[in-house]
């Protein structure tokens, strides 16, 4: 069982939290910066493996300049959990500036933890780190979509937030007339 430790260190201006468990090494979480493209690639590979979609996440990855610029962007957040140097959890989120008021919200786009590291608090630690990032950015809410049938994700998000019933539609831009 992982627990948040009181040992929070700084990596540049990006928070890095260390977590520890009795049967494993230290797990640390941090926001990835533009100098951590290799770790971003590992996060993409993790998403591909855990979502069963290697073709999307691993076979057509952007070049290093693109990923570096994305990690430098003020509207993209990539968080990772490391066991030693291996990425064992990752979260990708977008900062969405609002138009009706000068504030932003954050959308969790992807969140995954490797199979052998699940049920150890890593996803919760990544979301907690995202809360700190959101506070620093002045965001007023973090939201995430969970699919019916993904019971572990629904349970995690129920524990951490308030459920809203919404409808989601994918609109194909190639059908423009």
Swiss-Prot record:
For bias kind Polar residues, which ranges apply?
1-14
The free-text function statement in the UniProt record for this protein reads: Responsible for gentamicin resistance and has a limited substrate range.
Q: What does the record give as EC number? A: 2.3.1.60
Location of the region described as Disordered in the Swiss-Prot/TrEMBL record: 1-22
* PROSITE patterns with a match to the protein in the record: GNAT
- State the name under which the record lists this protein: Gentamicin 3-N-acetyltransferase
Highest taxon, organism lineage? Bacteria
- Domain named N-acetyltransferase: residues: 25-177
Q: Which NCBIfam families match?
A: AAC_3_I
* One GO term (biological process): response to antibiotic
UniProtKB keywords: Acyltransferase, Antibiotic resistance, Plasmid, Transferase, Transposable element
Catalytic activity line of the entry: gentamicin C + acetyl-CoA = N(3)-acetylgentamycin C + CoA + H(+)
In the record, what terms sit under GO molecular function? aminoglycoside 3-N-acetyltransferase activity
């Amino acid at each position: 069982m992982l627990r948040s430790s009181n040992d929070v260190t700084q990596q540049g201006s990006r928070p890095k939290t260390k977590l520890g468990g009795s049967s494993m090494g230290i797990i640390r979480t941090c926001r990835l910066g533009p100098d951590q493209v290799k770790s971003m690639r590992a996060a993409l590979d993790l998403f591909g493996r855990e979502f069963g979609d290697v073709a999307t996440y691993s076979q057509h990855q952007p070049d290093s300049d693109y990923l570096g610029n994305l990690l430098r962007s003020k509207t993209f957040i990539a968080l990772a959990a490391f066991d030693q140097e291996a990425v064992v959890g990752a979260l990708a989120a977008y900062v969405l500036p609002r138009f009706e008021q000068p504030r932003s919200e954050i959308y969790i786009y992807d969140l995954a933890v490797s199979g052998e590291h699940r049920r150890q608090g890593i996803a919760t630690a990544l979301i907690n780190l995202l809360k700190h990032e959101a506070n620093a950015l002045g965001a007023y809410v973090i939201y995430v979509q969970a699919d019916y049938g993904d019971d572990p994700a629904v349970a995690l998000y129920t524990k951490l937030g308030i459920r809203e019933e919404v409808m989601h539609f994918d609109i194909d831009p190639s059908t423009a007339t």
